[in-house]
Regions:
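Membrane topogenic/interface segments and analogous intrinsically disordered interaction regions
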Residues: 1-245
């Protein structure tokens, strides 16, 4: 059994090596440009709470260095995503038919675009609204907000990556439908469960406030509907199966 899996493991190692190498190279580039990247990350906070943004602090000796490394890795991961998606496709492509292999460019493009849409939605909508709500809530309770650059970057990277990955739902649905694992009737049948899972996922992946949770759950419910339409085109359920349901 191991001998049968060995070629696949070698191929997996190759694809992982290329992906990691790309991230390392991009990390070096991004670390050199860390000041510009950090300015981009702070822009949503400056836009809605300029006075608070002036007083972002560093309270630990190593915090500035660790934050710079974290920001550089975050940017490197984002810029490496097209290569990562490409390597994933190259790994699964040998098991697909020739007509399915022609989907490589649409797959990589679609996956990259959906991640970018999720990240942009988070950057321009979710992060400003969430920060404004959370900071103003603290001010209304007579708390004096002390924001460190480390906590801000942790918050920012967590929600942006979460939204980017969450927006991959139609891509995953397309892939599963293409290999025959799901059809549109499966998604329709489990719609209520999916909504529950979406809200639980949103609660874990967003800050602990209702606004952020709904800002993630709302678009995800819409993307689930889009996934149904995509799967309906790619792998529609047989008519007799639909009538039984």
């Amino acid at each position: 059994m191991f001998e049968e899996l060995k070629p696949h493991l070698i191929e997996l190692r190759k694809r992982l090596f290329i992906s990691v190498a790309c991230i390392v190279v991009m990390f070096i580039v991004c670390f050199a440009l860390r000041s510009y990247i950090l300015d981009i990350l702070k822009a949503p906070l400056i836009a809605v709470l300029p006075e608070v943004a002036k007083h972002v602090n560093v309270i630990e000796v190593q915090e500035a260095l660790f934050t710079a490394m974290k920001v550089s890795f975050f940017a490197a991961f984002i810029f490496s995503l097209p290569v990562i998606f490409w390597q994933f496709w190259k790994f699964v492509a040998p098991g697909l038919y020739d007509n399915e292999k022609r989907l490589v460019v649409p797959f990589v493009s679609f996956a990259s675009i959906m991640f970018a849409l999720g990240a942009c939605f988070c950057y321009f909508v979710v992060v400003p609204l969430a920060f404004k709500f959370l900071i103003n809530f603290g001010l209304n309770e007579d708390f004096n907000p002390v924001i460190t650059i480390g906590t801000y970057v942790d918050f920012f990277t967590k929600v942006v990556v979460a939204f980017g990955l969450a927006f991959e739902m139609p891509v995953i649905a397309f892939f599963f439908a293409k290999i025959g694992l799901i059809d549109d009737s499966f998604l329709k049948r489990h719609f209520r469960i999916a909504v529950l899972v979406i809200f639980v996922f949103s609660a874990f992946m967003t800050p602990p406030d209702v606004l952020s949770q709904f800002l993630m759950a709302g678009p995800l419910c819409g993307l689930y509907g889009l996934s149904i339409l995509i799967v309906q085109k790619v792998n529609p359920a047989p008519k007799d199966k639909e009538s039984d349901e």
